[in-house]
């Protein structure tokens, strides 16, 4: 099972709240067999502890440490929100990465996302990508 599959990418989405964005990221992972139904509630638990907004229009919601048992396969969902969504404290997210990692694979996933998002040009490419293949290509450049 691929960590980032085409089915895990939702382009050009419109959501009305941070909660809706997190739910969509989690539901995408559920629908494609990466996590159990309970994972979304663990994502919200994690968000209550501290915001998963990373700056530069990027948010990376994920489950709590206890949520590891809900992860069936390591994976990423990418929700592209070109118009942005209020993500708390005046921050706007335009790309939301839902992540789930078996064992410690989430650290590798986070590392790849951090490398990609350290370049402002890559963030612009993520926000403006017109196809799932375009987004996957950005990730393949890092690996």
From Swiss-Prot:
Subcellular location field: Cytoplasm
Keywords: Cytoplasm, Kinase, Phosphoprotein, Phosphotransferase system, Sugar transport, Transferase, Transport
Catalytic residues, chain numbering: 62
Coiled coil: none
Transferase keyword on record: yes
Domain spans labelled PTS EIIA type-2: 2-142
GO annotation terms (biological process): phosphoenolpyruvate-dependent sugar phosphotransferase system
PANTHER family the record matches: MANNITOL PERMEASE IIC COMPONENT, PTS SYSTEM MANNITOL-SPECIFIC EIICBA COMPONENT
Domain free text: The PTS EIIA type-2 domain is phosphorylated by phospho-HPr on a histidyl residue. Then, it transfers the phosphoryl group to the PTS EIIB type-2 domain.
Protein name, UniProt field: Mannitol-specific phosphotransferase enzyme IIA component
Organism of derivation: Bacillus subtilis (strain 168)
């Amino acid at each position: 099972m691929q960590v980032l599959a085409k089915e895990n990418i939702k382009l050009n989405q419109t959501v009305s709240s941070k909660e809706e964005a997190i739910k969509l990221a989690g539901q995408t992972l559920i629908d494609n067999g990466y996590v159990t139904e309970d994972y979304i509630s663990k994502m919200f638990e994690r968000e209550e502890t501290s915001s998963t907004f990373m700056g530069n229009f990027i948010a990376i919601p994920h489950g709590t440490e206890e949520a590891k048992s809900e992860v069936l396969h390591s994976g990423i969902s990418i929700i592209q929100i070109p118009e942005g969504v209020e993500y708390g404290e005046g921050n706007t997210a335009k790309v939301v990465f839902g992540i789930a990692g078996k064992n410690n694979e989430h650290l590798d996933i986070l590392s790849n996302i951090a490398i990609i998002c350290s370049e402002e040009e890559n963030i612009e490419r993520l926000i403006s990508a017109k196809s799932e293949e375009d987004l996957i290509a950005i990730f393949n450049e890092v690996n």
